[in-house]
Amino acid sequence: MPSDFPPGQAGIHARFRVDYPEFSLDVDLRLPGRGVTALFGQSGSGKTTCLRCMAGLAPVSDGYLDINGEVWLDSAARRAVPTHKRALGYVFQEASLFEHLDVLANLRYGMKRVPPALRRVDLEQATGLLGIGHLLARMPAGLSGGERQRVGIARALLTSPRLLLMDEPLAALDVQRKREILPYLERLHDELDIPVIYVSHSPDEVARLADHLVLLEQGRAVASGPLDALLTRLDLPMAMTDDASVVVTGEAAGFDPGYALLTLQLPGGRARLRFVHQAAPAGQRLRVVVHARDVSLALQQPREGSILNVLAVRVLEMAPAANPAHVMVRLDADGTPLLARITRYSRDRLALAPGMQAWAQIKAVSLLA
């Protein structure tokens, strides 16, 4: 089966049909050949099964898998590259380290699979990205859960994979350990040119890490597309959760050292956000997340108040939220999408309707790495 991507354009084509007695997976996905693609869905939706198909660990009734021009599976041609010959890294919920080896020996084990001439990630780069240089002499038994997972990710990177699979790598960690490891995952996103398929049922993780999103329900892909487009679709479940948010990419456009306020120019040209942060070079692209719960609406421009960011918006549509007392409102701020979660009472008091002009008051903005 030929590649479906335009000449010179890399990508991933993953088509799998898997039949179990009580579950079936039937997906046909065309994904970016770089960056992070998140597979999102509830337990039992088929996320891990899809990952196992990519790794060659699940029996596929009919399938095709092309990773940036390298075909690993083609049922029609009776071609199936065995797992140990697929250039992939796999990170599980809990890092499976060799307990009798120190961290350095664990990392070198990952490197042994790759001839020196084919290594795309070296030891210094992997330990630097994951911040584990000071752990090399430690034994796994002396590591925290977050440290173990960072070592496991570094070992996967040292196999110089053409594809990195991550199956809920933060699921086994407590809140503090998740906060510890997320910045390192963001660095991988920014600094490595390896496509990552990231399984999660956490909207917050997806918003922080992903570029592309696939929503799975009962073994079927109900939506697939750029993260920013899918996060604001009110017909999809992610926009209905308590963690509903949007991810906005803008450019650094000024810094006030007296108040440590960074200004971010949004894509539309007129809208800007300000938030407390260190200085950034003018023009540097930055990603921020804005949660729907942190956005309130007013019909008149607020003149006095402590909220820094007040943007002119247009109401696009509304839908009931997961909590029946609330509604979700999709907004446009000069080309920048936003979500607001407000009470039904506020909607009725303001008499909001699609097409209306309003003012969005943004109480918090979180900068992503």
From Swiss-Prot:
Pfam families: ABC_tran, TOBE
EC number: 7.3.2.5
GO cellular component, one term: plasma membrane
Keyword Transcription regulation: no
Membrane topology of the entry: Peripheral membrane protein
Domain Mop positions: 304-369
Superkingdom of source: Bacteria
Molecular function (Gene Ontology), one example: ATP hydrolysis activity
Binding positions for ATP per the UniProt entry: G41, Q42, S43, G44, S45, G46, K47, T48
Function per UniProt: Part of the ABC transporter complex ModABC involved in molybdenum import. Responsible for energy coupling to the transport system.
Family: Belongs to the ABC transporter superfamily. Molybdate importer (TC 3.A.1.8) family.
Protein name, as recorded: Molybdenum import ATP-binding protein ModC
Organism from which the protein derives: Bordetella parapertussis (strain 12822 / ATCC BAA-587 / NCTC 13253)
Lineage: Bacteria, Pseudomonadati, Pseudomonadota, Betaproteobacteria, Burkholderiales
